[in-house]
């Protein structure tokens, strides 16, 4: 690993690292916030997944999460949103290819060679964090928009791995909205049955009650993507039918931006702390 940046922050450290990923077949960067040590107990980790057009730095520089993470003693890990590089396939817009990995394992050429963000997040990155930093094995996950989709499917597909999950304005039903249809048809092919493996609503309907974990979702009612791309009511109905412990908060006047995330990130960190710090 190579350290790219390090900054003192709320008595902890904000760092950025590069490493060679064997899963994605390219170099990858991630950012990490290490809170000030309290005792000899390794701190838990919150993974944050960002949305379309983002990289590992958006949350780090815009969300203002470090102050509360330092207070609570929670490590923040921010991976990139896709594989990157000259040899990595790219798309024809902001919503496909680099910066738009959708946190799945692509099966179609030319994407399958590099676009295995699900495996990277499930296996390689946590193992790297565990080996290189003093952290516990307790972790939670959160994200925004495409990253909210990623956080929710990571939690559903890996029962017992995360203590809790949260999201801001997540894509919850990608099989049925333009962003998801475009990405899934390219990454996964035209067989829509294969898409269901990466759709939060489909996964929730197929889930077992004993695998449910506490879930918090915030959605702004002035979000320009609310009706066409996000549709949280569809997930709320799935959660109701499955008795999933989910809180959906509609926040008046808020849009899709990091101003929205910055306004409520403290709530999400304190929500996760209830379960991470047990």
From Swiss-Prot:
One of its GO terms (cellular component) is cytosol. The active site is at residues 145, 223, 256. Disulfide bonds: none annotated. It holds the Pfam family Esterase. Its EC number is 3.1.2.12. One of its GO terms (molecular function) is S-formylglutathione hydrolase activity. The keyword Iron-sulfur does not apply. It catalyses: S-formylglutathione + H2O = formate + glutathione + H(+). GO terms for biological process: formaldehyde catabolic process. Keywords: Hydrolase, Serine esterase. InterPro entries: AB_hydrolase_fold, Esterase-like, S-formylglutathione_hydrol. SUPFAM superfamilies: alpha/beta-Hydrolases. It is an enzyme of class 3 (hydrolase). Serine hydrolase involved in the detoxification of formaldehyde. Hydrolyzes S-formylglutathione to glutathione and formate. Belongs to the esterase D family. This is S-formylglutathione hydrolase YeiG. It comes from Shigella dysenteriae serotype 1 (strain Sd197). The gene is yeiG.
